Structures are given as structure tokens and as C-alpha cells.
UniProtKB/Swiss-Prot annotation:
Listed HAMAP family: Ribosomal_uS14_1
Species name: Wolbachia sp. subsp. Brugia malayi (strain TRS)
Subunit composition and interactions: Part of the 30S ribosomal subunit. Contacts proteins S3 and S10.
BP GO annotations: translation
UniProt keyword terms in alphabetical order: Ribonucleoprotein, Ribosomal protein, RNA-binding, rRNA-binding
Entry GO MF terms: rRNA binding; structural constituent of ribosome
Family: Belongs to the universal ribosomal protein uS14 family.
InterPro entries, alphabetized: Ribosomal_uS14, Ribosomal_uS14_bac/plastid, Ribosomal_uS14_CS
Signal peptide (from-to): none
Protein name, UniProt field: Small ribosomal subunit protein uS14
Protein role: Binds 16S rRNA, required for the assembly of 30S particles and may also be responsible for determining the conformation of the 16S rRNA at the A site.
Record's GO cellular component terms: cytoplasm; small ribosomal subunit
PROSITE patterns per the UniProt record, alphabetical: RIBOSOMAL_S14 (PS00527)
PANTHER family: 30S RIBOSOMAL PROTEIN S14, SMALL RIBOSOMAL SUBUNIT PROTEIN US14M
Length: 102
């Protein structure tokens, strides 16, 4: 189990990313557009750094297991880590997944 504080921090980052995502994308498009004058691009970059929280960036979000909070070995399709997924699959808790045999 991951510490509750770390899981909560990640949830806060997800919420901030949803809240500021649109504004961040607009500023990033201005910064990366070569047709806009350099002064405006620098102003947009300054605004991005000063006004938006650092945690509102998508890159700071970590995929974590929904049950344990484990940060590694997480399957995106299920939102579970490999250990929990294997346990749930072996007990038949996930529909459509069966142990292979040949």
C-alpha cells in the first residue's frame, strides 16, 4: 500500500490538471506558434510559469493502482497493478478475463 498522502497528492494533481488544462493548452499553443511575434510568445511563457500551478501539468500525474496506490506495473485498461489484477482474475472477479490454458 502506498501512503495515503501520496495518493491524495496525485488526486489533487489530477484535479488541477482538469481545472487548468484548457488554459495551459492555449498558452502552450501560443508559445509553440512560430508565426506569433517573439515578445508575445515570451509573455505567454511568463504567464504560464507565474500564473499556473506547477502541479497542473499532465506530466506530473502518476498512474496508480485504484485499490493499492502502487505506482508501478499498472495496466491502464483496468487501472489496477499487475498483482491485484492477477488476484482478481484468478478469482473470476473481472468479467471476460479467464486464465489461459492449452
Amino acid at each position: 500500500m502506498a501512503k495515503k498522502s501520496i495518493v491524495q497528492r496525485n488526486l489533487r494533481r489530477i484535479k488541477l490538471c482538469d481545472q487548468y488544462g484548457e488554459k495551459r493548452e492555449r498558452l502552450k499553443s501560443i508559445i509553440n506558434n512560430k508565426n506569433i511575434p517573439i515578445g508575445e510568445r515570451f509573455a505567454a511563457q511568463n504567464k504560464l510559469i507565474k500564473e499556473l500551478p506547477r502541479d497542473s501539468s499532465k506530466i506530473r500525474i502518476r498512474n496508480r493502482c485504484a485499490l493499492t496506490g502502487r505506482p508501478r506495473g499498472v495496466y491502464r485498461k483496468f487501472g489496477l497493478c499487475r498483482i491485484v489484477l492477477r488476484g482478481l482474475c484468478s478469482f473470476g472477479k473481472i468479467p471476460g478475463i479467464t486464465k489461459s490454458s492449452w
